Amino acid sequence: MITVFGLKSKLAPRREKLAEVIYNSLHLGLDIPKGKHAIRFLCLEKEDFYYPFDRSDDYTVIEINLMAGRMEGTKKRLIKMLFSELEYKLGIRAHDVEITIKEQPAHCWGFRGMTGDEARDLDYDIYV
């Protein structure tokens, strides 16, 4: 699950392009097939979103949940790719983006009636 937070006025019109950037970055950075993760957009009203004073209304928070196992360099590459692509494709400055990768052990994941450590048919590798 990926969650993206931002001001409704800025985030709502960009949802489709943001999803495309995130899916492409996950594919290029982690070799995850496009569309494999759910993305939830939380479009907040200005009075519901207090962000740092030195950020613009473009301020966007991206939280990415992953099964643990990827190398530090792989995760850093993904983060830097997202910063770059968001600025290049959507005009959102890196200064206005916050990205958090949250990892949990495979046994803490549940999907398709099994836990992540029981899945033997993933079409991507979590140990990259």
UniProtKB/Swiss-Prot annotation:
Q: Which SUPFAM superfamilies match?
A: Tautomerase/MIF
Q: Name the Pfam families on file.
A: Tautomerase_2
InterPro entries per record: Tauto_MSAD, Tautomerase/MIF_sf
Q: Which PANTHER family match?
A: TAUTOMERASE YOLI-RELATED
Q: What is this protein called?
A: Uncharacterized protein HI_1388.1
* Organism phylogeny: Bacteria, Pseudomonadati, Pseudomonadota, Gammaproteobacteria, Pasteurellales
